[in-house]
A protein has these predicted regions:
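Hydrophobic alpha-helical transmembrane segments of small proteolipidic membrane proteins, enriched
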Residues: 1-15, 215-221
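Gly-rich Lys/Arg/Thr-decorated short loops/hinges at beta-loop-alpha junctions or inter-strand turns
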Residues: 1-9, 96-99, 161-163
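Membrane-cytosol interface motif
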Residues: 13-30, 34
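Histidine-anchored nucleotide/phosphate-binding helix
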Residues: 24-25, 49-66
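Long, charge-dense
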Residues: 61-63, 67-113
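Short, well-structured alpha-helical segments in soluble
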Residues: 115-123
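Extracytoplasmic/lumenal ectodomains and periplasmic regions of secretory and membrane proteins
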Residues: 127-176
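C-terminal functional extensions of proteins
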Residues: 166-229
Length: 229
């Protein structure tokens, strides 16, 4: 974290799904149809904050191209945050007059599924961005996007929903990639430092497992005995 704060540089690979966002924005601009950004379903967790960073980047790209994006929020507490993120994106690129607050919508949990499907159908969205905490809604929204021919980019850390996103979407951030994407886009020292530390811990754990397996195969149990202490 200190190194990133000092140098502003830590090696984080840019994910293919992030490049696809630029492709999707170009698509909605050429087709003259809006995009839809759905921030998961009714639970606010770490995935929600990662989705905020992706929303910020996407909104800036949409604003630059003077295109339109409808943001669907499942929780009242994230509605004002989303409004400020999208409004800030338009201000940043000098298009504040193009910002439409009606395109950032709170959809109550009881009506969320029907409301999102209605938006997809009525607006004939050309691209969908499905990021955040998803359950069975993943297949509902992704299939609805397929019906209208949208280019779809998704991401969730809920591994039990990933098969539906992978099957239905053009690009998917798999598992913890959504957190990596959020850290990559935000360049926040705390997020980047946490991400790098987690990855380093994973490499260390894998190395210990491999070394231990080799040593046990060679009938050397010194590492096993050490870890038991």
């Amino acid at each position: 974290m200190r190194k990133f704060s000092r140098t502003g540089n830590l090696p984080i690979r840019r994910l293919a799904g992030l490049d696809a966002i630029d492709e999707a924005v170009g698509r909605i601009t050429e087709m003259g149809r809006p995009a839809a950004f759905v921030q998961g379903v009714g639970v606010m967790d770490a995935q929600t904050f990662a989705a905020f960073e992706i929303l910020k980047y996407t909104a800036e790209q949409v604003a630059k191209h003077d295109a339109r994006m409808i943001v669907c929020n499942p929780l009242p507490e994230i509605q004002p945050i989303s409004e400020e993120i999208v409004r800030g994106a338009y201000i940043k690129v000098g298009r504040e007059d193009s910002y439409n607050p009606d395109d950032v919508r709170y959809l109550a949990d009881t009506s969320l599924r029907a409301a999102v499907l209605g938006i997809f159908q009525r607006e004939k969205v050309a691209a969908t961005f499905l990021f955040g905490n998803y359950y069975h809604e993943s297949v509902i929204f992704a299939e609805a996007g397929n019906v209208v021919g949208a280019l779809q980019i998704s991401g969730t850390a809920n591994t039990h929903q990933l098969p539906f996103f992978v099957a239905c979407c053009d690009y998917t951030l798999i598992g913890e990639e959504i957190f990596a994407a959020g850290a990559y886009l935000s360049r926040n020292p705390a997020q980047v430092g946490s991400l790098v530390a987690q990855e380093a811990a994973k490499f260390f754990a894998v190395a210990i497992i491999l070394i231990g397996a080799i040593m046990v195969t060679a009938n050397n149990k010194s590492l096993v005995d050490l870890l038991k202490k």
